[in-house]
Amino acid sequence: MTAAIHHDAQDLRKPLPLLRVELATTPEDVYASQRLRYEIFAKEQGAHLESAREGIDRDYYDDYCHHLLVRRTDTHEVVGSTRILTTPNARRAGSFYSETEFDLHKLFPQLRGNAIEIGRTCIHPDFRNGAGIGMLWLGLAQFMEMHKVDYMFGCASISMNDGGAQVSAIMNDARLNNLAPETLRVKPLMHLLPAQPAAKVAMPPLLKAYLKLGAWVAGEPCLDPDFNVADIFILLDVNNLNTRYHRHFVQGSLQKRPASEVSLLRAA
């Protein structure tokens, strides 16, 4: 799958790289994703990673996940990635990654069905103009459509460099507009200390994308000290996917893409 990157008028003199989204099929593909994750999480954001000496971000769950990659078509460089853990593979792993941060017992009836967890989402700085995350959502939407996924969930991370001011503001907004029903809320295993909310909400792009799709914030955030972030648990009932985004990412994209480009996701 390929899509042109759209630049502002002042950037039109620059070549416009094309992007494609695909599932990793080789160990080298997965390694490229782990290298990008290291560059973003450790070098850019200062996360403390157990695998940092190897120059990658790798953990136990990687071996059980599908890895979705966004590549430049000219250089084949991986510029975006996320990983997908399906319910059957979570059973093989012994748990979902989110269970290391949240008590998910209220969600177990939903997660016994066809659910996916996404995580470790990152985009190269040069592609944070919407193109990189857009391609990831395109791939995720097609994966969900082809595998008949009912629920998608994962964590959206908020930096704690400000002592929790921004996450406090975001949660105040979420409690008013996006909070999941009580029966679908999770409990954090490590609570945040109270913080004075920031004067202005600065919604991270990933969280903003989740909420535009119609996702819920499913409870209070969890502190992740290794990454120095607060993780907000997000739950999306795919059957309630925002109609406009479903039409754009799923119906429209599947109709326009050649069969050869769609088959890679279907085979996962």
Residue locations for each model-derived region?
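Short amphipathic alpha-helix that is part of the acyltransferase structural core
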Residues: A9-T86, R91
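Short secondary-structure junctions and interdomain/linker hinges
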Residues: I40, E44-A47, V217, L241, ...
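Long, contiguous binding/interaction regions
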Residues: N240-N242, H246-F249
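Eukaryotic low-complexity, non-globular regulatory regions
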Residues: M1-A4
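Acyl-donor binding region in acyl/amide transferases
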Residues: T87-W216, P221-I234, N240-L241
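Residue-level signal for alpha-helical context at structural boundaries
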Residues: S51-A52, I158, I170, N228, ...
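A broad, low-specificity signal for short, low-complexity segments enriched in glycine/proline
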Residues: T26-A32, A42-G46, V78-R83, R112-A115, ...
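Short, cationic low-complexity segments
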Residues: G252-A268
